[in-house]
Amino acid sequence: MFRTMMKSKIHRATVTHADLHYVGSVTVDQDLMDAADLLEGEQVCIVDIDNGARLETYVIAGERGTGVIGINGAAAHLVKPGDLVILIAYGVMNEQEVKEYSPRVVFVDADNKQIELGSDPAHAPEGSGLITPRMLSTLEASRESSLV
């Protein structure tokens, strides 16, 4: 059996530009592509944190060190400059590959510079203000006890 697994994620990147008059794709800083193990032409899902839009496209390499996250083509109707997005790539793996593979999870700052690289898809960096799904039962318990 084959499974579709998350292989890479660039988390909470800021869209630097959106250009409707382009053939399509997302332009990503080559440094971020390397960190996330993304290849030019690879399919990615883009999730817009600000408006909930989800779309699929492919990656085009952007200039290293620029922090570029550029939305190109029709997707510019859905994702705007300044929006926070998550770029996710999936891979189809057999059972053995699933056991051996670790995803690449890249966290970036407001300028799209890498601040953390890990492999836990549910990790929330300290000080990020994000909540990991693995903490939900602990959070619910603390909320309930504060209501008593």
From Swiss-Prot:
GO MF annotation: an example: aspartate 1-decarboxylase activity
UniProt-annotated location(s): Cytoplasm
Location (main, coarse): cytoplasm
Residue sites binding substrate per the record: 57, 73-75
GO cellular component: cytosol
Pyruvic acid (Ser) PTM sites in chain numbering: 25
Pfam families for this protein: Asp_decarbox
Protein origin, superkingdom: Bacteria
Cystine pairs: none
Subunit-level organization: Heterooctamer of four alpha and four beta subunits.
Protein name listed in UniProt: Aspartate 1-decarboxylase
Organism in which the protein naturally occurs: Rhodococcus erythropolis (strain PR4 / NBRC 100887)
Originating gene: panD
